[in-house]
């Protein structure tokens, strides 16, 4: 029962159940025929939702596209590859995972014909953009298919695999690192080198390595995806 300040009592029955949050909370046309898609996660089937939203925006006359990945913590790797495939040709290597065992090493390529290889794209990112979101934004940057706008991303370049435990529990085990088209890994924290107290730190910029995009632009590994255009605040 719930009571108010006036001591009225309201009785409500609440049913506990699973709720599927939308992967695309909003999409629409902005001024100047700019299409906008807010992609909040990579759980479920976001590539299907994204495709439907994009095709609808095209019908409405969108001539350019903004993909908002701010605070998107990631999810399924293959879903990020699917969305990249909408904008780049078939047969492109998007992600390579490398682990200590053969089963943890894989290559993910674009397998289908794209939806649109010409529409101008801007991707919004911030420090909450992580994992599969960095695969999407970093791959589009490496292939010179989009302009990345905002702040440096989180820097999660590791792949975890869930293992079932008794009593319905799960344990996530890190099995590999992932590498995007330029060959770089965006992992920011160097777990291989710990401080005396056992803590770990981010890889300093001075120790990062230069890689190159398809058009020859310099990009760096470590520390996430750095934007092409840095903005302190995006409203």
What are these regions (language model features)?
Residues 182-231, 235:
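Conserved functional hotspot residues or short segments at active or partner-binding sites
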Residues 118, 143, 168-173, 206-208, ...:
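Active-site lining segments that contact anionic ligands and/or coordinate catalytic metals
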Residues 3-166:
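Cleft-lining beta-strand/loop regions that shape enzyme active-site pockets
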Residues 20, 179, 225:
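Short loop/turn segments at secondary-structure transitions that flank enzyme active sites
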Residues 13-14, 99, 175, 190, ...:
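Short clusters of small/polar residues that mark proteolytic maturation junctions
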Residues 125, 133-137, 165-168, 173-174, ...:
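Functional cores that coordinate and move charged inorganic groups
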């Amino acid at each position: 029962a719930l009571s108010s300040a006036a001591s009225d009592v309201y009785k409500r029955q609440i049913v506990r159940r699973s709720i599927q949050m939308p992967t695309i909370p909003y999409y629409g046309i902005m001024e100047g025929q700019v299409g906008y898609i807010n992609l909040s996660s990579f759980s479920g089937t976001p590539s299907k939702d994204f495709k439907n939203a994009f095709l609808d925006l095209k019908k409405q006359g969108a001539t350019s596209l903004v993909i908002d990945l701010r605070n998107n913590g990631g999810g399924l790797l293959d879903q990020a590859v699917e969305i990249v495939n909408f904008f780049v040709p078939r047969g492109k290597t998007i992600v390579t995972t490398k682990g200590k065992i053969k089963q943890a090493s894989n290559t993910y390529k674009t397998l289908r014909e794209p939806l649109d290889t010409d529409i101008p794209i801007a991707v919004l990112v911030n420090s909450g953009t992580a994992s599969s979101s960095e695969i999407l934004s970093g791959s589009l940057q490496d292939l010179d298919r989009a302009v990345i706008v905002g702040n440096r991303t989180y820097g999660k370049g590791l792949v975890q695999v869930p293992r079932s435990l008794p009593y319905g529990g799960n344990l996530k085990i890190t099995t590999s690192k992932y590498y995007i088209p330029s060959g770089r890994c965006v992992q920011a924290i160097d777990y291989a080198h710990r401080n005396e107290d056992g803590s770990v730190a981010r890889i300093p910029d001075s120790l990062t390595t230069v890689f190159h995009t398809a058009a020859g632009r310099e990009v760096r590994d470590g520390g996430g995806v750095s934007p092409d255009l840095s903005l302190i605040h995006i409203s």
